[in-house]
């Protein structure tokens, strides 16, 4: 097996096994292709369903964990008996092919298996974490990253990934924000669609494509206190206007599976939530793929307190619309009895099994159940690594650059100190959810900097801390000495990958351990200090931001993060990432996000009073009286959409094509963008809108468009956006989507804090 006997032997075994399987099945496949040529997809589904026994139907609704390299007798027997429709976590291609052989050749009807895996942001070649990919604001690179991941995963026989994770999250304490696409529904929707397209390709039956799974449906990212699995309470209006939008975009992009969330939504756990999966997903959106539970979440309905036992949990999940159970046997154990008792109609089971079979047919599994890695692109090929590098490059956000400290110049410096626990950490830079990521492929920042400038200047390296959480500071004196002897210092700080992801929420999201103390000690040397931060979430950086000259926020950048960071530090490229989530000043500001409501008492700079400026005996109503915190104000440390460049971009002359448009019409909004700096660079131009008066209160700003443009020094271009009145639609009091006539403000700029604004009016043509 791969990883035990070595890649060469594994390749020989794989080819031999596959060749034998292909010889045995080629004639059968040819006959099957001819027989199915004149049948439509639905006819094929219906015909197969008509041949199935009830036990075989229930088997298709059962997914089994098959992570052991050795195939046990119980699994062989279950697949051969038609009691398994899908396996997950088996990544040895020989084992996968053998399990497919059992399903195709030994089961009565020969129905192939879905093979699932969490391929979240890469397989062997790892892209930046999804939150980092969202910082690219580039659907093309996100799509291609998913495409690379699909091709690599397919070499292991995987045909289904549990991605993209598209939960909106406004709470950086939540560990799974690392897997998300940020806080904004417009940006998340655009990138969700791109990921689905990347995984699934133009035709699911093509070799190297895999089924995508949009998760977690729905509201999981709004967990109370940012604690994973915690309760979520989201009013239906907000649910529809914010949290459901990326899922609708994924469905519109053709995603074939969804995963129900673990969490309790408004009193009903998502796994048992008929409103979500039948009313919204099926009836309103017309989804015809299938829904899978999260790991053992059917059984957990009883733990929530929604049901009394496993049997009632199965009843609730099936009635709600969960087509397949992941990693549990409750469906196998209970469904037949529930049907026999007349509580669940077999017609409902038929419809659910049809959803699963439909995806198997779409994937072409009946024609091509086996995997031959030789038919697919090589793992970690040049294109894959270049895609990972470009994604990392575009994901890094320049938060701060006082006095133009960056980029560093190898010509002007004689030496540079690289200090910190994450400068040379090949595993940590990959981020969370990298079951299959290959650390041998990782190029760390320290090695990349040596490669880029080591021949021109003296590069000195000290880890200084064992890991990001270390409290011992015995190496700090040595770090200070190295810093004093160097012309500039690059600190690699942040959090290890294990501190984010599922079940890894944090109450304090500042730099862990003694990192802030390390920053303070290095600052005292008086040398220019650049902080490069690797993390799986936005962090509160208030305690270090004034002690460093520049900050590059690199997320967990993946396999090629090192070369990307080195290129940015030394000016080979200019940073172009923009924040997909707000950075709070203090954790107590959470949830903090740019598209909040105005309230009846909106804060402004002249209404904010700091806690230290209040007299001890001041009367209660003598100050403020607006929505802010006494100790943090109301603004974030860094706003959504923020990201600096080595170029200087100037926005001016915002215009609309008409001051008034009718419902159903399109408006052109444009502004001039000038590069007044000395270097060519890319900028993400952002369009925001505010609906001033509406059926329900609306956000103070909403992202409605973005474009990534490259501009040479001294050049000016006009950037325009088309804005249709449908783009202004929202769900009102009656939960119906509508666009209302009225006055709108519109902004164009480089972040959500842009002040370049004009306005227009929408009128009812009637």
Segments predicted by a language model, with ranges:
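Flexible, membrane-facing loop/turn or short amphipathic-helix motifs
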Residues: 732-734
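Glycoside hydrolase catalytic-domain context in secreted enzymes
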Residues: 20-725, 729, 741-752, 759, ...
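Bacterial N-terminal signal peptides that target proteins for export
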Residues: 1-13
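Hydrophobic membrane-insertion alpha-helices, especially the h-region
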Residues: 12-20
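Surface-exposed, short loops/turns at beta-strand junctions within beta-sandwich domains
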Residues: 737-739
